[in-house]
Amino acid sequence: MDYVLGIDTRITLLITGFIFLSALLLGVWKYHGIRVDGAAHIYVDIAHRAALMYSFAGILLAVFTELSAWPTIVNLTADLVVLAFFIGAIASYVLHGLRRDTTNQFDGQIPAGLRLSMYGLIAGEIGGFGVLFSGFVAGQF
């Protein structure tokens, strides 16, 4: 029996595959830090772990997307919002790891831009998944 995944699911899996590949590459960077200094910079470690976690979360997004009752464009938009925030978070961790400028980006006075981006991340990730989950519930129950 042949089954073709929807384009929204395939795009989600493609992006998720790149996130997983980045996790593997970040693991090499982390290993290098451990080998040279005994421990990788905290944000290199966080970037590696976050990329691994987000890659598996992306697989969950793909499953909920495929089983959603909502139109393709709705599912794809929700996926892209969530994945964009995943990628943005990883990128910010990589930046801090490269610059070695902090061990806690939320220590002290938090700049308005960072605070705003965190509110966006919260709304985007929870809202995007909420769309997919409600589509799953509507389509499967």
Predicted regions and their residues:
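Alpha-helical membrane-spanning segments of integral membrane proteins, especially the hydrophobic core
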Residues: 114-118
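Hydrophobic cores of alpha-helical transmembrane segments in multi-pass integral membrane proteins
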Residues: 11-32, 44-65, 79-97, 119-134
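Juxtamembrane membrane-water interface segments of multi-pass membrane proteins
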Residues: 2-7, 27-43, 58-77, 96-111, ...
